[in-house]
């Protein structure tokens, strides 16, 4: 049997199906995903799209009754028979299969492929769709005991090529044809999708019946059945082979993945090796650099060695010459010793010396005698001094005793004074003192008492009369019945606190009445004071009680009143209830109407009348009670006032009495004080005179003593002079010793130099030896490094070779694997091939593993080889660091040792020790002298005492006396000599030590001075070097920053240029589009005319003239015309065909249904109306063309809007970045300036300190030199014995030294005072400046506060208008006058500064402004842009936008102003921030009215200012240069009136707050010019530092609110203002995108507000300049924001016209009804106004 069984079916299938490339690419991507998946995912059994029943087949026994046979038959019918189209669609098949595909029996989409010689078949659609999911009708199947479930795997393109197999071609292929005709599949997809188990059983029964019919019909054809069974067996065999191949493929895939994984590992290792290689190369390069450095060092050392050798040779030559000279000198010395002339000179010298010594001895003896005499005189004077001292001490003691006595006296007197004062105070406090005081007062005031008593009597009588009147009133009130009945009887009311305080006791009212009767009876009698007081007290008590009673009554009345009120309220409530009941009864009566009407009305009326009467009665009672209460209140108030007056008078009397008592006491006290003072002063004067006499005596005595002491001091000075002479002699001896010491030092220095030379030679020898050893070691290291490098290179070569071999092996294995797979696909008979391939693959794998092992070993070896030098290098580095640390420690220690003597503490300790040593030496010398003298005296005394008892004869005594005298004389001579010798020794030793110390101190000072100078110089040099380095670094950084900024500016200019180019291209594209549209319109008209019958040639010329572009020609016209005609012809042919077909259809319909009338179906949309003529066709074509053109225009506009929006977003971002960069630049500049200032200040400070220190050191050096010269002069002076006038010259030398010292000290003191004074003056100046600043600030704050208060008061007056009802004009005039006064007051503060600065700025800006205006006008005239067009410009916060090219050409370039001008302008900005802002005049009308606008901006505002609208109104801004170097881009703002409404309000009526900033007078023009007409960099810097949203704050005043002139007018609208400058419209990307959606609103606005045809809607706006916005502004706003205003777009304007015509009927006159209120803002320097200035 042939194996090519089902190739025909496969070929037909391949021919019918078209191979899709996209599906093939998807399969490739899936294959890559599957190869990347792990093994666990691939081994899943349910992951393949194969059918489980692909392995199921018959067992080979047809007649055996087994249950699996039935199922196998069902499987044959199900799988061999073709599946319906609906089922395939349900399973995810998307392609309609042809009838030929359904008729092939052998086509199984999910099973294996063909293994015949037909080759690879393309993959099916089901495999692509069902790669990762099973079909919905899938059920696993097991074909009996012998057959197991097949393993489901994912499909890949290599395997899918095998999985499409069917019946091969053969001789029995024709016998299978009847199966195609008989067995058609069941096509109901819903049955198979949602089939229940019963339905499945029914279907299986049906298939069994069909199978039995088929078998019964073909029992004769048993050979064919056998053939089918054989084919099934073959299919099973093929399936098994396929399974084995699939398993092998899986193995191969796993191997491939494993190999790919290993490949990745190897690649990572390769990368690691490459990194290590790079590191090793870097190390090698570092080593080379170190070698080069070492070589350079070695060369330098060799050069030094050669220099040393040359110096050695020179030194050896010098030594030889010096040795020769020494030998010659020795010979000369020997010859001189032998010469006679020298001997004679020696003898002569010795004789002179002997004579000089004799003379010196004689002089010394004479001097010693003189000294003895002076010593004796000194001793006498010392004894006299001791006596005088004792006398002085006695006198001091006497004086102290006198002082003590005086102090005791003073203390006693003070004590007695204090006692007397205490006694006086006690007496005054006691009663006797009071009696004395009363007597004195009676004596002194005897005459005044009578007058006072009379006056008091008169006052009391007046008061009594008043009280009588009051009592009569009170009695009349009691009679009337206000008081209770028992008031005449005994009232047992307790006294109040006020009565107790006044001292009033209880008194019966009867007694008071009796008293009153007695008073009435005897009015002529004069009562005494006590009686009067008692009467008054009783009256007061009675009044107080009556007052309390009255109060009680008032409280009772108040309670009664409250009760009455409560009753009244209750009555009112009842009345209200009655009224409510009346209303209720009325309602009930209305409902019932008839029942109980008459009776209820009568009853209610009676009740109401009764209640009314009661209410009237109660009201009368209430009024009476209120009147009574008011009367009682008035009476009570009068009584209270009277009581208050009484109490006040009593208090006043009390105070007067106390004041009198105090006066008398003070007078007495002062009199006593005066007496005591007089007595004490007299005593003090006497004692003072006595003490003065005593002190004068003591002073005379002391003066005499002082004269004596002065004489003694003169003698002592003479002695001191002699001592100084001796000192000079000792100094001469010291000089000699010093010279000897210097010679010894020189010898020592020579020996030291010789030692140093020897040491140098030894060190040089050692250095040469170490050099040799180091050279040898370096050569060895170099050789080792070369060997290591060679090894590394060989290793690298080996690694590369191994990589190449491994790669080649991999490629070979992959190629062999591919070949094996291809052989398997084509040849099914060769089964042994996979085994061979697997062996080859195993061998390749083994080879790879071996190569890997070798590579790993090599890598380990290389790593170990690399580690060793790294470890050595680390050890060397650690040693170097340790050495550096040790050297640093040693250096620090040496510096510390050197700096020790420099310290102030060390010097202070040295001085203190020196002073202590000097004191100790002086004390020791004095102690020795005193000991020697005391010993001598004691010996003499002991000898005398010993001699006294031995009474001898007179001769012997005389002889003894003489002998003793001689001995005494000798001893006296010897003792001073010994003393002198000891003193001289001590002095010599002290002088020596002192001189040594002086020399040491001088040397130390010189060394310290040198070190200090060197350190100071080093420090200064270091500081200067650091400063230079910092300056260089800062300079480099600044250069880099400037370069980056320059690059940024270049990039920005490039971007702007690209934007301009894009805009130009867009403009050209628009022109082309417009030209094409015009051409098409004219051509369409021409074609219509041609079809109409008359065509004109003049239209071509008109079209040529209308088109602006040059590229349109006659040929182009002809081509376009031909194309249009062709298209029309085609359309006509198509339309005629369609019309003919429709007519035929209609005829058929008419013939079939005659009853249906065509008239009823005229409105039907499905039936097309026949076109009778060609004119209807043309109309339809023209309408279609118009629609198409409108759609294309809309699309183009949308696309351009999107592009522009994106570009504007990018532009905004770039401009923000530019602004940030400029801010950073300015900050950097400020920082640099600050650094430069600080640097200069630091350098100046250092220089000043250095100069001060140098001056101080120079002064100290001069002082030290002067001292040294004085000492040398002292040392150089010859001894006293040689010159006779030495004694005379010693005095002036000492005086000169003293004078010089005094002069130096005086100069130092003067300098110190000068410095202190300068410092004090500087500090005082600083304090004064601070005080002045504080005062100025305080004054400013006070003035600002005053102005604020005045401003608030003015505002209040303006708002209140003082309650006067005046007219509107008067109010406005008064407000204007108040504001003018405020402005004058406020303007006085900064008027002078502003005038000066404005004048300077005006001079600097006038000429460039004129040139810029001229150039701007010329360019604008050339470019043909209309200057009279008013524009609306909105300043948005934080958004700057570039201008188009045309605008940039119009605006002239400007140069950056200097820094001083910028500062001036910044200060002006701060001083003149708020500007006057006024709203529209009140005669602004809309609708039929007119909008009269004073052209303030046109007249007053310079062309450098542009009206820019913020959220609150218009502001003035400066035109800015777009292409100037270093200038910021112009604030590119859009018309807020167009786009603001789309963001905030979408309602047709939007209330606007309009403001319009104007300049009040032409006098303010220079200020604005000075402020605004600077360079763009200045304005940009100012704008960036201040708020960027210029004029974006809303004004707080909302009175001037009125509806705007358009239905879509925004909330913050503006009014047009003309200016001769050229302005442009633009907006941000966000608003453009929002406005593209809300185009209707701004179309309405543009049609009503800015369109030239706005007169149709009864809208008239009159101003000094024309307010006609062109059509292009609207088009530029609708998505072409960057374009200029010179290119109109007819489509947008036509659309707007149509929209306006639709919406103009809404009536704009109804929208503009209220006029806008005129608002006047305060003047500039006031900041609390609430108005926003345009310059903020």
UniProtKB/Swiss-Prot annotation:
Descriptive protein name: Centrosomal protein of 152 kDa
Assigned protein family: Belongs to the CEP152 family.
Subcellular location: Cytoplasm, Cytoskeleton, Microtubule organizing center, Centrosome; Cytoplasm, Cytoskeleton, Microtubule organizing center, Centrosome, Centriole
Bias-annotated ranges (Polar residues): 1576-1595, 1603-1614
Listed InterPro entries: CEP152/SHC-Transforming (IPR051235)
Any Gene Ontology biological process: centriole replication
Function text: Necessary for centrosome duplication; the function also seems to involve CEP63, CDK5RAP2 and WDR62 through a stepwise assembled complex at the centrosome that recruits CDK2 required for centriole duplication. Acts as a molecular scaffold facilitating the interaction of PLK4 and CPAP, 2 molecules involved in centriole formation. Proposed to snatch PLK4 away from PLK4:CEP92 complexes in early G1 daughter centriole and to reposition PLK4 at the outer boundary of a newly forming CEP152 ring structure.
Region (Interaction with PLK4): 1-60
N6-acetyllysine: modified positions: 1714
Keywords: Acetylation, Cilium biogenesis/degradation, Coiled coil, Cytoplasm, Cytoskeleton, Phosphoprotein
Principal localisation: cytoplasm
Residues modified to Phosphothreonine: 1277
UniProt KW Ribonucleoprotein keyword: no
Keyword Acetylation: yes
Composition bias type Basic and acidic residues, residue spans: 61-82, 94-105, 575-592, 1462-1473
Coiled-coil residue spans: 228-481, 552-651, 692-776, 835-868, 950-1075, 1205-1315
Residue ranges of the region described as Disordered: 1-127, 571-592, 1416-1479, 1543-1562, 1574-1614, 1677-1736
Domain of life: Eukaryota
GO CC annotation: centriole; centrosome; ciliary basal body; deuterosome; nuclear body; pericentriolar material; procentriole; procentriole replication complex
Subunit details: Interacts (via N-terminus) with PLK4; the interaction is mutally exclusive with a PLK4:CEP192 interaction. Interacts (via C-terminus) with CPAP (via-N-terminus). Interacts with CINP. Interacts with CDK5RAP2, WDR62, CEP63 and CEP131. CEP63, CDK5RAP2, CEP152, WDR62 are proposed to form a stepwise assembled complex at the centrosome forming a ring near parental centrioles. Interacts with DEUP1; this interaction recruits CEP152 to the deuterosome. The interactions with CEP63 and DEUP1 are mutually exclusive. Interacts with CCDC66.
Leader sequence residues: none
GO MF annotations, alphabetized: protein kinase binding
Organism: Mus musculus (Mouse)
Transmembrane segments annotated in the record for this chain: none
């Amino acid at each position: 049997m042939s194996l090519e069984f089902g190739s025909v079916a496969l070929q037909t299938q391949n021919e019918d199906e078209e191979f899709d490339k996209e599906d093939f690419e998807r399969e490739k991507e899936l294959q890559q995903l599957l190869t990347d998946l792990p093994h666990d995912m691939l081994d899943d059994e349910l992951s393949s799209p194969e059918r489980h029943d692909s392995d199921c087949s018959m067992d080979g026994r047809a007649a055996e009754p087994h249950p699996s046979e039935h199922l196998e038959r069902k499987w044959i019918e199900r799988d061999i028979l073709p599946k319906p189209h609906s089922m395939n669609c349900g399973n995810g098949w998307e392609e309609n299969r042809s009838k030929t595909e359904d008729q092939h029996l052998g086509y199984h989409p999910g099973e294996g492929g063909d293994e015949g010689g037909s080759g690879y078949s393309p993959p099916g659609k089901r495999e692509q769709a069902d790669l990762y999911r099973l079909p919905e009708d899938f059920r696993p199947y097991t074909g009996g005991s012998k057959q197991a479930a097949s393993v489901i795997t994912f499909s890949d393109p290599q395997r899918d090529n095998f999985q499409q197999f069917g019946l091969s071609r053969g001789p029995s292929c024709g016998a299978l044809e009847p199966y195609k005709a008989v067995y058609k599949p069941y096509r109901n997809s819903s049955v198979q999708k949602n089939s229940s188990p019963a339905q499945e059983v029914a279907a299986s029964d049906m298939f069994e019946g069909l199978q039995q019919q088929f078998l019964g019909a073909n029992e004769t054809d048993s050979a064919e059945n056998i053939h089918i069974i054989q084919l099934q067996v073959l299919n099973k065999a093929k399936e098994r082979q396929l399974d084995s191949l699939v398993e092998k493929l899986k193995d191969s895939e796993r191997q491939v993945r494993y190999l790919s994984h290993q490949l990745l590992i190897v690649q990572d290792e390769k990368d690691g090796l490459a990194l290590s290689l790079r590191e090793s190369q870097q190390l090698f390069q570092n080593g080379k650099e170190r070698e080069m450095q070492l070589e350079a060092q070695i060369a330098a050392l060799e050069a030094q060695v050669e220099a040393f050798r040359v110096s050695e040779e020179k030194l050896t030559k010098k030594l030889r010459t010096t040795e020769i000279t020494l030998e010659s000198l020795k010979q000369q010395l020997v010859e001189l010793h032998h010469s006679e002339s020298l001997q004679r000179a020696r003898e002569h010298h010795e004789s002179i010396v002997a004579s000089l010594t004799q003379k010196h001895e004689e002089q010394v003896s004479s001097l010693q005698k003189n000294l003895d005499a002076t010593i004796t005189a000194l001793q006498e004077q010392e004894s006299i001094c001791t006596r005088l001292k004792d006398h002085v001490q006695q006198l001091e003691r006497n004086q102290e005793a006198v002082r003590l006595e005086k102090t005791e006296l003073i203390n006693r007197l003070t004590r007695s004074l204090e006692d007397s004062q205490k006694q006086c105070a006690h007496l005054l406090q006691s009663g006797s003192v009071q009696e004395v005081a009363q007597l004195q007062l009676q004596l002194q005031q005897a005459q005044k008492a009578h007058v006072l008593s009379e006056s008091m009597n008169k006052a009391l009588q007046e008061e009594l009369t008043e009280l009588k009147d009051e009592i009569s009133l009170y009695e009349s009130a009691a009679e009337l019945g206000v008081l209770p009945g028992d008031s005449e009887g005994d009232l047992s009311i307790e006294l109040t606190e006020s009565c107790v305080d006044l001292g009033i006791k209880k008194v019966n009212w009867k007694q008071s009445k009796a008293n009153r009767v007695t008073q009435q009876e005897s009015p002529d009698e004069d009562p005494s004071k006590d009686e009067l007081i008692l009467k008054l007290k009783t009256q007061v008590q009675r009044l107080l009680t009556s007052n309390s009673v009255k109060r009680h009554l008032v409280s009772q009345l108040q309670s009664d009143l409250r009760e009455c009120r409560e009753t009244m309220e209750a009555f009112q409530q009842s009345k209200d209830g009655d009224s409510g009941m009346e209303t209720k009864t009325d309602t009930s009566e209305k409902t019932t109407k008839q029942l109980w009407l008459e009776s209820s009305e009568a009853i209610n009326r009676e009740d109401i009348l009764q209640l009314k009467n009661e209410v009237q009665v109660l009201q009368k009672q209430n009024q009476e009670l209120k009147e009574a209460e008011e009367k009682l209140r008035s009476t009570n108030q009068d009584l209270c006032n009277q009581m208050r007056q009484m109490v006040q008078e009593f208090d006043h009397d009390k105070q007067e009495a106390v004041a009198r008592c105090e006066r008398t006491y003070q007078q007495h006290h002062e009199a006593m004080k005066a007496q005591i003072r007089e007595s004490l002063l007299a005593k003090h004067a006497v004692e003072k005179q006595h003490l003065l006499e005593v002190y004068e005596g003591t002073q005379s005595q002391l003066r005499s003593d002082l004269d004596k002491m002065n004489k003694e001091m003169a003698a002592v000075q003479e002695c001191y002079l002699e001592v100084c002479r001796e000192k000079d002699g000792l100094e001469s001896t010291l000089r000699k010793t010093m010279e000897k010491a210097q010679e010894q030092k020189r010898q020592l220095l020579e020996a030291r130099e010789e030692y140093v030379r020897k040491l140098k030679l030894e060190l040089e020898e050692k250095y040469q030896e170490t050099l040799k050893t180091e050279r040898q070691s370096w050569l060895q290291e170099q050789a080792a490094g070369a060997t290591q490098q060679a090894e590394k290179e060989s290793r690298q070569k080996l690694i590369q070779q191994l990589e190449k071999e491994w790669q080649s092996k991999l490629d070979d294995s992959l190629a062999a694997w591919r070949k094996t797979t291809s052989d398997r696909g084509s040849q099914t008979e060769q089964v042994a091939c996979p085994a061979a391939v697997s062996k080859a693959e195993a061998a390749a794998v083994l080879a790879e593993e071996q190569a890997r092992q070798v590579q790993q070993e090599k890598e380990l070896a290389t790593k170990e080889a690399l580690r060793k030098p790294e470890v050595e290098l680390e050890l060397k580095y650690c040693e170097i660091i340790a050495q550096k640390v040790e050297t640093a420690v040693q250096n620090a220690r040496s510096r510390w040792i050197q700096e020790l003597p420099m310290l102030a503490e060390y010097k202070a300790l040295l001085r203190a020790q020196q002073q202590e040593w000097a004191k100790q030496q002086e004390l020791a010398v004095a102690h020795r002298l005193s000991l020697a003298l005391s010993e001598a005296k004691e010996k003499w005394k002991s000898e005398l005492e010993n001699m006294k008892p031995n009474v001898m004869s007179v001769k012997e005594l005389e002889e003894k006396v003489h002998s003793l005298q001689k001995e005494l004389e000798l001893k006296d001579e010897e003792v001073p000599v010994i003393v002198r010798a000891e003193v001289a020794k001590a002095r010599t030793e002290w002088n020596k030590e002192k001189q040594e110390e002086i020399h040491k101190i001088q040397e130390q000072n010189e060394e310290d001075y040198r070190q200090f100078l060197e350190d100071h110089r080093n420090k200064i040099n270091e500081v200067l070097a650091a400063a230079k380095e910092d300056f260089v670094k800062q300079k480099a950084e600044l250069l880099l920053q400037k370069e980056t900024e320059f690059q940024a500016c270049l990039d920005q200019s490039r971007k702007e240029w690209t934007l301009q180019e894009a805009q130009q291209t867009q403009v050209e594209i628009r022109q082309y589009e417009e030209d094409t549209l015009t051409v098409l319109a004219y051509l369409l008209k021409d074609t219509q005319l041609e079809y109409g019958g008359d065509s004109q040639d003049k239209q071509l010329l008109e079209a040529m003239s209308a088109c602006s572009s040059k590229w349109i020609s006659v040929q182009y016209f002809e081509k376009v015309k031909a194309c249009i005609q062709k298209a029309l012809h085609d359309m006509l042919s198509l339309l005629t065909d369609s019309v003919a077909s429709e007519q035929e259809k209609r005829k058929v319909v008419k013939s079939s249904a005659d009853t249906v009338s065509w008239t009823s179906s005229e409105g039907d949309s499905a039936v097309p109306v026949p076109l009778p003529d060609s004119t209807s066709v043309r109309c339809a074509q023209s309408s279609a063309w118009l629609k198409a053109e409108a759609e294309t225009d809309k699309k183009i506009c949308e696309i351009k809007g999107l592009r522009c929006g994106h570009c504007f977003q990018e532009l905004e971002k770039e401009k923000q970045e530019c602004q940030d960069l400029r801010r950073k630049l300015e900050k950097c500049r400020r920082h640099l300036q600050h650094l430069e200032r600080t640097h200069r200040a630091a350098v100046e400070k250092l220089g000043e300190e250095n100069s001060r220190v140098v001056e101080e050191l120079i002064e100290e050096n001069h002082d030290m030199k002067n001292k040294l010269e004085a000492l040398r002069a002292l040392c150089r002076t010859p001894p006293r014995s040689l010159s006779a006038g030495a004694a005379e010259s010693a005095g002036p030398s000492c005086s000169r030294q003293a004078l010089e010292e005094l002069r130096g000290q005086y100069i130092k003191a003067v300098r110190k005072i000068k410095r202190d004074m300068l410092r004090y003056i500087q500090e005082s100046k600083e304090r004064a400046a601070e005080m002045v600043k504080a005062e100025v600030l305080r004054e400013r704050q006070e003035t600002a506060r005053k102005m604020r208060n005045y401003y608030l008061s003015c505002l209040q007056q303006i708002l209140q208008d003082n309650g006067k009802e005046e007219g509107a004009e008067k109010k406005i005039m008064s407000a204007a006058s108040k504001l003018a006064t405020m402005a004058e007051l406020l303007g006085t503060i900064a008027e002078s500064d502003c005038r000066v600065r404005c004048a300077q700025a005006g001079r600097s800006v006038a000429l460039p402004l004129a040139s810029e205006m001229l150039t701007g006008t010329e360019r604008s005239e050339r470019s043909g842009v209309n200057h009279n067009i008013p524009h609306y410009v909105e300043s948005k916060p934080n958004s700057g936008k570039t201008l188009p090219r045309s605008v940039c050409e119009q605006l002239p370039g400007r140069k950056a102003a200097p820094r001083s001008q910028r500062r001036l302008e910044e200060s002006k900005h701060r001083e003149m921030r708020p500007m006057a802002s006024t709203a529209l005049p009140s005669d602004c009308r809309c609708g039929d009215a007119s909008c009269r606008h004073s052209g303030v901006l046109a007249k007053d505002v310079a062309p450098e200012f542009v009206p820019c609208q913020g959220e609150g109104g218009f502001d003035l801004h400066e035109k800015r240069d777009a292409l100037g170097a270093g200038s910021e881009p112009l604030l590119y703002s859009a018309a807020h009136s167009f786009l603001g409404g789309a963001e905030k309000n979408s309602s047709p009526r939007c209330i606007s707050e309009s403001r319009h900033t104007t300049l009040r007078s032409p006098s303010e023009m220079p200020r604005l010019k000075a402020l605004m007409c600077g360079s763009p960099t200045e304005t940009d810097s100012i704008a960036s530092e201040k708020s960027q949203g210029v004029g974006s704050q809303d004004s707080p005043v909302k009175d001037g609110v009125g509806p705007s002139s358009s239905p879509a007018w925004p909330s913050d609208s503006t009014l047009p203002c003309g200016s001769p400058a050229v302005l442009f419209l633009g907006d941000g990307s966000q608003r453009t995108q929002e406005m593209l959606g809300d185009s209707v609103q701004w179309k309405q606005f543009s049609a009503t507000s800015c369109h030239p045809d706005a007169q149709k809607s009864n809208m008239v706006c009159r101003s000094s300049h024309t307010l006609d916005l062109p059509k292009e502004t609207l088009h530029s706003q609708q998505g072409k924001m960057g374009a200029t205003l010179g290119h109109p777009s007819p489509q947008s304007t036509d659309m707007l016209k149509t929209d306006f015509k639709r919406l103009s009927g809404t009536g704009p006159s109804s929208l503009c009804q209220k006029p806008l209120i005129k608002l006047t803002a305060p003047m500039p320097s006031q900041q609390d106004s609430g108005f926003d200035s345009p310059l903020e």
